């Protein structure tokens, strides 16, 4: 039998993860753009991720432009590069907090979880598929590592690029991204 005290937490985690995986499908873009292949990029922008800062702090692109972001984590902590508006970041921060509280997100990376301890029936589920950080507008970068995100911006708007790992956005790890017409 599934312990009663674990049921509410498990249902919340499953709801967040199923919702996130539906939104994370590569076929799904955002209102402001969509993922692209690096070969389609008209230019590359290097972004340094430090402990609680981005360099540069502001980026300008043009509507219709495809940009390859080359991300270098020079900090000692795991960081995220996520494109979106303030409301999107606030929502994603809730998901990241769930991941941290579940033990999946550590200060320096993603941990694997032993779901066999979660109760009857849970061990047979494909948790590896469910618990992923794979939104197309976001990438996690471990300390000392590099990653890339290529994006086509489809309309003029004001966005942010941010790290939504719990506490990082609040500590100032957010930059302005302006999409010019």
Curated annotation (Swiss-Prot):
Disruption phenotype: Disruption of the gene leads to a copper-sensitive phenotype. Transmembrane segments: none annotated. Induction: Induced by copper stress. The keyword Isomerase does not apply. Residues 1-24 form the signal peptide. The keyword Transmembrane does not apply. Keywords: Copper, Metal-binding, Periplasm, Signal. Its main location: periplasm. InterPro entries: BlueCu_1, Cu-binding_ET, Cupredoxin. It is found in: Periplasm. It comes from the Bacteria. GO terms for cellular component: periplasmic space; plasma membrane. Pfam families: Copper-bind (PF00127). GO terms for molecular function: copper ion binding; electron transfer activity. Gene3D superfamilies: Cupredoxins - blue copper proteins. Cu(2+) binds at residues 79, 163, 168, 173. Involved in copper tolerance. Belongs to the CopI family. Restores the copper-resistant phenotype in the R.gelatinosus deletion mutant under anaerobiosis. This is Copper-resistant cuproprotein CopI. It comes from Pseudomonas aeruginosa (strain ATCC 15692 / DSM 22644 / CIP 104116 / JCM 14847 / LMG 12228 / 1C / PRS 101 / PAO1).
């Amino acid at each position: 039998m599934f312990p009663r005290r674990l049921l509410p937490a498990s249902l919340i985690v499953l709801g967040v993860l199923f919702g996130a995986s539906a939104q994370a499908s590569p076929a799904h873009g955002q209102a402001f753009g969509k993922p692209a292949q690096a070969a389609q990029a008209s230019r590359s922008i290097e972004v340094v991720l430090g402990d609680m800062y981005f360099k540069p702090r502001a980026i300008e692109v043009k509507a219709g432009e495809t940009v390859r972001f080359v991300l270098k984590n020079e900090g000692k902590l795991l960081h995220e590069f996520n494109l979106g508006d303030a409301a999107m970041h606030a929502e994603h921060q809730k998901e990241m907090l769930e991941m941290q509280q579940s033990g999946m997100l550590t200060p320096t990376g993603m941990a694997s979880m032993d779901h066999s301890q979660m109760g009857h029936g849970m061990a047979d589920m494909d948790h590896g598929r469910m618990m992923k950080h794979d939104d197309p507008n976001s990438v996690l970068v471990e300390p000392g590592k590099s990653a890339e995100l290529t994006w086509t911006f489809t309309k003029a708007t004001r966005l942010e690029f941010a790290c939504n790992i719990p506490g990082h956005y609040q500590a100032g790890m957010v930059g302005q991204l302006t999409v010019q017409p």
